[in-house]
């Protein structure tokens, strides 16, 4: 895989040629839930005020038609920006990715190329557009009560349908978000996010494995988190690009 392609895929934020333990089900196969939308929302841990920063490292497994790859990643994120550094299998740093509110800056150290892309610009590839996900929001997916229309259930899960057509699946016992399914034609850069292996860390229940699927379903990227720290003081969330390397705006 070319380094620049790997960076773009990492911008999915972070993620499995590996399978998922939760198998998606249509709500037509489920029964109406015995809880209200308010109760559904209250079951989900909400760290929007208390979880301010994340720092960690892990391994990203990338799977797309005809190829797969494995990359080591280090990341730092607050709620405004996310900085990701990745290395190849032999430990050579390949590049950095900085995701901000309206753009993603990609620096390919191997090819010495820097590109800045508007998050919602038409020139951003489908894979690259997955960079729109902030890491703190990715680890603690925000769910607004006002967006929930209906709730369904089976013996293990509650599934909510939102006013924009998303389906949000949570574990009935823990309230942990397990799966986010986007409707066709939603305009989102991904079709599905899957969460596994929650652990308790410094007052937060956070997933240790996250898988994101591209909109066409052909590409999957999974992050297996090895180390994770919360609410630390972060280094500057910026990329130091050497003099003489222009930033190409696409």
Residue ranges of predicted features:
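Sec-dependent bacterial lipoprotein signal peptides
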Residues: 1-18
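Gly/Pro-enriched, hydrophobic low-complexity segments
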Residues: 152-250
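N-terminal mature ectodomain segment of secretory-pathway/periplasmic proteins
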Residues: 48-110
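Well-ordered beta-strand positions in beta-sheet-rich domains
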Residues: 70-74, 94-96, 114-116, 167, ...
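Hydrophobic residues embedded in beta-strands of well-ordered beta-sheets
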Residues: 81-82, 104-105, 114, 156-158, ...
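N-terminal leader/targeting segments and the immediate start of mature chains
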Residues: 18-72, 246-250
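Short, solvent-exposed secondary-structure boundary motifs
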Residues: 61-67, 83-90, 136-146, 156-162, ...
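Flexible, processing/modification-adjacent segments and terminal tails
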Residues: 40-41, 108-167, 239-243, 247-249
